Swiss-Prot record:
Keywords: ATP-binding, Cell cycle, Cell division, Cell shape, Cell wall biogenesis/degradation, Cytoplasm, Ligase, Magnesium, Nucleotide-binding, Peptidoglycan synthesis. It comes from the Bacteria. It comes from Bacteroides fragilis (strain ATCC 25285 / DSM 2151 / CCUG 4856 / JCM 11019 / LMG 10263 / NCTC 9343 / Onslow / VPI 2553 / EN-2). Its cofactor is Mg(2+). GO terms for biological process: cell division; cell wall organization; peptidoglycan biosynthetic process; regulation of cell shape. UDP-N-acetyl-alpha-D-muramoyl-L-alanyl-D-glutamate binds at S30, T153, T154, S180, Q186, R188. The gene is murE. ATP binds at G111, T112, N113, G114, K115, T116, T117. InterPro entries: Mur-like_cat_sf (IPR036565), Mur_ligase_C (IPR004101), Mur_ligase_C_dom_sf (IPR036615), Mur_ligase_cen (IPR013221), Mur_ligase_N (IPR000713), MurE/MurF_N (IPR035911), UDP-N-AcMur-Glu-dNH2Pim_ligase (IPR005761). This is UDP-N-acetylmuramoyl-L-alanyl-D-glutamate--2,6-diaminopimelate ligase.
Length: 485
């Protein structure tokens, strides 16, 4: 593709050099540059891509996109100066890969909790209907049934457009995608065309990055502000920010709720450990999910599928066949008669939702033992809140290590313990070794009890000092239960 074709989608401040050159690849990582590539320098959170411009030129880059031009311009290289490289990178990548999102029905899911579940269940629902479908999520990316490992909730713009391009080329009609607040703020989705967007909820998370809840809200809201006119926005009325999210959107707004009058109205009729009986828009259905938060997630899936043209009755049949997503309220029964639940809950609100769901099913007939930690080098303010919520809704709590990253596990545990009063501390243990913490919970559990192992869910590693060590909560539980993994 000619450089001048790529530049039609962005507004350069200044161009130095030949725009008629052939571009054979686009990169934001100088290590991946090859001869004939366009290297795009971004101000990253860890490193500044501008520092790698000489390395990119040395490796054969024939064009450089940047915010600040180097002091010395290499001969035979075209330099494109832009005001905002984050925005330009997304648009350039979209153009280079043939604007793949315009060939797909792309639906984005954003919010603090529920993104993975809703995106994955939509993917499974439309596969049930017989379509080729793509999924971009925290757990794994999929092109129909081909799994593609994932590093981030939302990939960088180049990886994202390359992936969407493959999905379009391989015949996918629908793609369901988690859209993180980081990706919106960093404009990773710049240039993409969405057919629809779903808002789940907004609670405290990622304040290490966004600094304030207001900034976090603005990042989420921008996704809906940028929605095109002929798309839909489906928002959760049960969240106080539901209508705030869509107040400036050009898209058609629809609502879903378990509490209020809405376009898609749901109720929980019955709840058991095996699942729930629900009412969606005056239709009853039985599902293999537990908890009001999952009823809300399923209602969002129902609404989105209907907005994408499916009949309500057909969607209800599809929903009744679905299974819970890996690491989301993932229950296994022990030979001793207690139940262990592995869940990704890593925010105070998500933890409350899971514990409430457990109590809703238990009805006071067994103890709840919660194993929980908090991630290192992340929002420290939520640590004492997590511990307090765990203690409030559990009979025993074991505070342990999660992904300590570059912090000391005991320091994180101490931050969590600071949220507990004297009564809370009487029922709380702190065990830094996560495996030992889970083992202790199993030793304390009796028939009819429930152990919640919270925070990591689907993850199969522990991030310690920059190294990912294999660790899987479900594997550990099965090992303790003496079950075959």
């Amino acid at each position: 593709m000619k450089l001048k074709e790529i530049l039609t989608s962005i507004q350069p401040v200044k161009i130095t050099g030949n725009q008629d050159i052939e571009i054979t690849g686009v990169d934001i990582d100088s290590r991946q540059v090859e001869s004939g590539h366009l290297f795009m320098a971004m101000h990253g959170t860890q490193t500044d891509g501008h520092a790698y411009i000489p390395a990119a030129v040395e490796k054969g880059a024939t064009a450089i996109l940047c915010e600040e031009l180097p002091a010395e311009l290499a001969e035979g290289v075209t330099y494109i100066q832009v005001a905002d490289s984050e925005d330009a990178v997304g648009k350039a990548a979209t153009t280079f890969y043939g604007n793949p999102s315009s060939k797909l029905e792309l639906v984005g899911v954003t919010g603090t909790n529920g993104k993975t579940t809703i995106a994955t269940l939509l993917y499974n629902t439309f596969r049930y209907f017989g379509y080729k479908v793509g999924l971009i999520s925290t757990v794994c990316n999929y092109i129909d049934d081909e799994a593609i490992p994932t590093e981030h909730t939302t990939p960088d713009p180049i990886t994202l457009n390359r992936l969407l391009g493959r999905m379009a080329d391989e015949g996918c009609k629908y793609v369901f995608m988690e859209v993180s607040s980081h990706s919106i703020a960093q404009k990773r989705i710049s240039g993409l065309r969405f057919a629809g967007g779903i808002f789940t909820n907004l609670t405290r998370d990622h304040l290490d990055y966004h600094k304030t809840v207001e900034n976090y809200l603005k990042a989420k809201k921008k996704f809906f502000d940028d929605m095109p006119k002929n798309s839909f926005s489906l928002t959760n009325l049960d969240d106080k920010n539901g209508l705030v999210m869509t107040q400036n959107t050009k898209s058609k707004v629809y609502t879903y709720s378990l509490r209020s009058l809405s376009d898609f109205k749901g109720r929980v009729l019955e709840s058991h450990f095996e699942g729930m009986l629900l009412d969606f828009n005056n239709h009853e259905l039985a599902v293999q999910f537990i908890g009001k938060f999952n009823a809300s997630n399923l209602l969002a899936v129902f609404g989105a599928a209907v907005l994408l043209g499916k009949k309500e009755e057909d969607v209800l049949v599809a929903l009744s066949t679905l299974h819970p997503v890996a690491g989301r309220f993932d229950a296994i029964r022990s030979p001793q008669g207690y139940t262990a639940i592995v869940d990704y809950a890593h925010t105070p609100d998500a933890l409350v939702n899971v514990l409430n769901a457990i109590h809703g099913v238990l009805e006071g007939k067994g103890k709840v033992i919660t194993v929980v930690g908090a991630g290192g080098n992340r929002d420290k303010g939520k640590r004492p809140i997590m511990a307090k919520e765990a203690a409030r809704a559990s009979d025993r709590v074991i505070i342990t290590s999660d992904n300590p990253r570059f912090e000391e596990p005991q320091d994180i545990i101490n931050d969590m313990l600071a949220g507990l009063d004297t009564e809370d501390k009487k029922k709380t243990l702190s065990i830094a070794d996560r495996k030992e913490a889970i083992r202790t919970a199993c030793m304390l559990a009796e028939k009819g009890d429930v152990i919640l192992v919270a925070g990591k869910g689907h993850e199969n590693y522990q991030d310690i000092k920059g190294v990912k060590h294999h660790f899987d909560d479900k594997e550990v539980l099965k090992e303790i239960f003496s079950l075959t993994v």
